[in-house]
Amino acid sequence: MVDPVAALCNYNVLEVIFSYLELEDLNHCSQVCKSWYHFLNDENSDVWRWHCLNKLPKEALKSDLLASVSTYKTKLRAYFHAWSPNDCSRNVYIKPNGFTLHRNPVAQSTDAARSKIGFRHGRHTWEVIWEGPLGTVAVIGISTKEAALQCHGYVALLGSDDQSWGWNLVENHLLHNGDMQGSYPLLNNAPKYQVGERIRVILDCEDNTLSFEKNYEFLGVAFRGLPDKKLYPTVSAVYGNTEVSMVYLGTPLDG
């Protein structure tokens, strides 16, 4: 019979030790034994809470931006998948909350940003929230590391080459390799995007497809035949002072 006092002491000791480890080390620890795996599998444990409160900006934790990621562990994961301050146009900066990009009011420029982490395997979903005016062109989608992040003029930069795929929210057009790939979604009089709506982007690296959801409604597959390359969540914008947030959700739920 397990002594409950000893079990509690063991729990408290693990809690203290794991709180001082790096996140990569926690992943290794979860593979040591079943006991440690179950301990770390509690995504709202004090260990994940401690790491979340110490690594995430307070601005993000105070807002409702992370409403779709309910546990401390998923909030941490979303933060490490957020926009990269080192992989964006010079006219873009990432706000202190770590999840929102701000495009500076620079004339005759189109500017883009990519996430910190890209995907080549598995299925992934993330939310994009456009929190400012769209302007004449506002594109969400994916790109490889080779896709440009800035160009002259006001254009659909994302989708302008063979390294990027995008949905222009202003005109409801799909874009790739500089060509319009058709209207999207395939609905009569499809409603236009409203500022503040959450769009879910679904990347399936097994089926090589990209799809979108809006208001929990699946809009259909937008792109097929994606290449076997690492693909990154990406947006491109033209409107000065507009802001776009991105929250990584993990594996999409079917149904």
From Swiss-Prot:
A biological process from GO: negative regulation of gene expression
Main subcellular location: other
Domain B30.2/SPRY: 61-253
Pfam hit, one: F-box-like
Keywords: Neurogenesis, Synapse, Ubl conjugation pathway
PROSITE patterns: B302_SPRY
CDD domains attached to this UniProt entry: F-box_FBXO45, SPRY_Fbox
Residue ranges of domain F-box in the record: 3-51
Known pathway: Protein modification; protein ubiquitination
Example of a GO cellular component annotation carried by this entry: neuromuscular junction
Annotated function: Required in the presynaptic motoneuron to down-regulate the levels of wnd and restrain synaptic terminal growth at the neuromuscular junction (NMJ).
Family statement: Belongs to the FBXO45/Fsn family.
Subunit structure: Component of an E3 ubiquitin ligase complex composed of hiw and Fsn.
Protein name: F-box/SPRY domain-containing protein 1
